[in-house]
A protein has these predicted regions:
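Short beta-strand element of the alpha/beta-hydrolase
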Residues: 99-107
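Primarily recognizes the serine-hydrolase "nucleophile elbow" in alpha/beta-hydrolase
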Residues: 178-246
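Short amphipathic alpha-helix adjacent to the substrate-entry channel of hydrolases
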Residues: 117-134
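C-terminal catalytic histidine-bearing segment of alpha/beta-hydrolase fold enzymes
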Residues: 278-322
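N-terminal cap/lid segment of alpha/beta-hydrolase-fold proteins
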Residues: 40-94
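Alpha/beta-hydrolase active-site loop
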Residues: 151-194
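Conserved alpha/beta-hydrolase "acid-adjacent" motif
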Residues: 259-264
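Short beta-strand/loop motif that positions the catalytic acidic residue
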Residues: 252-254
């Protein structure tokens, strides 16, 4: 699927009443925190050293010619034009390891990845709680190499019409086929090295942010052999879905002032409840879109501790007996 169609798909998932500026913020990977406003300019940076990153072996997107590049913004770092998917392990101290694992999918509208705020920082915090975490750097649609052209291309996409209807699950999976392939490869890799990484192959979950939440949901509903044991949707779309009888426990966090996804109802939550599957939903008064691990003066900052408490409630912070 073309970049334009992908962005329009995301726009449609956001709902007809989503403000264009909110959509632009989401597609750039985050909502600007007031304390970080001085860092809102995109600045090119060298590609960070990633010695622990493991190539997943999935092929580059067709006609992908622009090389991977990185930039800083809002005090975080972002990757663009990713053509080689990787998985980076963040393993806990063996003495603290619970056997649970989480694959972390950053957001960024499928044309950038918020690698720090929604990736590495999340993984480090999970590892500190005894959970093995793996940051998925999935393949992205190509955008112009220069940041000015990148920004211009997004503005042009946002000016286009929106799709006439919400895509069904099969269409969503087809539109994200390369990213879904990366997610499936990530689950396969973790399971293949479960003994080495002290991971219980039956306790591997996934957490996604914004676009990464979309990928998490598609992986859950159409990922075949991925089979996440538990999932978290952090400020992703809450459109209703067809929930399978064996759907995993779901954790959701969203801010009421999220201009992208807070105005379209809570269909996802209702779908999980109607199917009789476990779901926990935190709806914060303020936080905007893209709060991630940023320190903010809003209660949305508490989402991670709430998530950890949820993991504990499901027995995932204790090693499995026997």
């Amino acid at each position: 699927m073309s970049l334009k169609r992908r962005l329009l798909l995301i726009a449609r998932l956001a709902g007809r009443n989503a403000a264009p500026i909110a959509l632009a913020i989401a597609l750039f990977g985050m909502g600007p925190a007031p304390a970080l406003a001085q860092d809102d300019a995109m600045t090119p940076i060298r590609t960070p050293a990633q010695p622990e990153a493991i190539p997943l072996g999935t092929p580059p997107l067709p006609d992908a010619k622009v090389p991977e590049s990185w930039h800083s913004q809002y005090g975080s770092v972002f990757a663009r034009n990713v053509t080689e998917a990787t998985l980076t392990p963040f393993l806990p101290d063996p003495a603290k390891a619970t056997g649970a694992a989480v694959i972390v999918a950053p957001g960024g509208g499928f044309r950038s990845l918020s690698m720090e705020n929604e990736g590495w920082d999340v993984a480090r915090a999970l590892a500190d709680r005894g959970v093995a975490a793996f940051v998925l750097k999935y393949r992205l649609n190509q955008t112009p190499a220069d940041l000015e052209g990148f920004g211009r291309s997004i503005r042009e996409m946002l000016a286009g019409p929106r799709p006439p209807r919400q895509p069904d699950a099969a269409e969503a999976a087809a539109s994200l086929a390369p990213q879904l392939e990366d997610a499936r490869a990530a689950f396969a890799l973790v399971r293949s090295r479960a003994d080495e990484w002290n991971v219980d192959p039956d306790r591997i979950g996934m957490i996604g942010f914004s676009a990464g939440a979309m990928l998490t949901m598609v992986t859950t509903l159409a990922g075949e052999d991925a089979r996440p044991a538990f999932i978290a949707d952090i400020y992703g779309p809450l459109s209703p879905v067809k929930v399978p009888a064996d759907a995993p426990p779901l954790f959701v966090a969203l801010a009421a002032d999220d201009g992208l996804f807070a105005g379209s109802g809570f269909g996802l939550i209702e779908s999980w409840r109607a199917a009789g599957r476990p779901v926990e939903f935190h709806f914060y008064e303020r936080g905007g879109h893209g709060f991630g691990m940023y320190p903010k003066d809003t209660t949305s900052t508490g989402w991670f501790e709430a998530y950890v408490s949820w993991l504990r409630m499901h027995g995932l912070l204790q090693a499995k007996a026997g």
